[in-house]
């Protein structure tokens, strides 16, 4: 049950889609699902990079680098597409800010690092694993159908919404899930969604004045959230991290 998973989260989310030769084992602890772990990793990685840039002790830097390197193993094993999209947005944003600041050394290092990560993802089979999972589980098509149903239902109660997610029998998933944007829109109407969008705009605008590398990484968190909240739910610790 979901309540038990919140209190005693499993170490991994085991998925057995119909027709798949083997089960997909996706690390999730200390969260109830691999998606929650992926989103937390998306939000906290830029924070750790900002912390790394501000540390003065070489030993603390080495310890943090080792910890971050080890954390990539379960993160990659989640095969979470949203996590890679969010981290890519953060990295691209920081690279753009460094480019606009004419910090060519940082730009060169950033391009090299991004290229190395892309090569590693293909070489490790991570990309093949993500694409292979889609052959047996059309989660993209299922989400699209759910989003259409959520939109149509919200149009019937656009001001105050429905208060809580509701099951869509034809899809088998509750409307108002699979993305915080849809949760806000379905549960609290377009008014609730507009208020959260205003909060995000103010957060992005207030952080645009940063001029340091660590500041760029911290500011990349709300920038990435402007996209990942479309398909990720900020329902556990993620919203606290953002705020």
Name the predicted role of every residue range.
Residues 69-74, 114-122, 222-232:
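Aromatic-anchored segments of alpha-helical transmembrane domains
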Residues 79, 183-188, 214-243:
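Membrane helix-loop boundary segments at the extracytoplasmic
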Residues 1, 78, 95-136, 151-156:
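A membrane-periplasm/extracellular boundary helix in multi-pass inner-membrane enzymes
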Residues 52, 58-61, 88-92, 96, ...:
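Hydrophobic transmembrane alpha-helices and their immediate junctions
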Residues 60-63, 82-84, 103-109, 215, ...:
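Short, aromatic-rich membrane-interface segments at the entry and exit
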Residues 21, 25, 125-191, 203, ...:
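Long extracytoplasmic/lumenal interhelical loops at the membrane interface
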Residues 32, 38, 184-196:
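Membrane-interface anchor segments at the N-terminal boundary of transmembrane helices
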Residues 1-79, 84-97, 202:
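Alpha-helical transmembrane segments of multi-pass inner-membrane proteins
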């Amino acid at each position: 049950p979901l309540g038990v998973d919140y209190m005693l989260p499993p170490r991994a989310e085991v998925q057995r889609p119909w027709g798949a030769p083997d089960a997909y084992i996706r690390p999730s602890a200390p969260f109830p699902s691999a998606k929650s772990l992926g989103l937390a990793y998306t939000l906290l990685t830029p924070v750790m990079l900002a912390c790394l840039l501000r540390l003065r002790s070489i030993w603390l830097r080495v310890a943090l680098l080792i910890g971050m390197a080890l954390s990539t193993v379960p993160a990659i094993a989640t095969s979470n597409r949203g996590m890679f999209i969010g981290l890519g947005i953060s990295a691209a944003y920081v690279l753009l800010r460094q480019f606009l600041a004419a910090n060519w050394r940082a730009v060169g290092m950033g391009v090299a690092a991004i290229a190395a990560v892309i090569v590693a993802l293909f070489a490790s089979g991570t990309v093949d694993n993500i694409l292979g999972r889609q052959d047996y589980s059309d989660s993209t098509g299922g989400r699209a159908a759910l989003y259409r149903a959520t939109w149509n239902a919200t149009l019937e109660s656009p001001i105050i919404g429905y208060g809580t997610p509701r099951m869509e029998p034809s899809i088998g998933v509750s409307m108002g899930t699979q993305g915080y944007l849809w949760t806000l829109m379905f549960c609290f109407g377009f008014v609730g969604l507009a208020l959260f969008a205003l909060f995000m705009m103010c957060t992005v605008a207030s952080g645009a004045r940063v001029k340091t590398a660590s500041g760029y990484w911290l500011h990349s968190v709300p920038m990435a959230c402007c996209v990942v909240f479309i398909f990720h739910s900020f329902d556990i610790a993620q919203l606290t991290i953002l705020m």
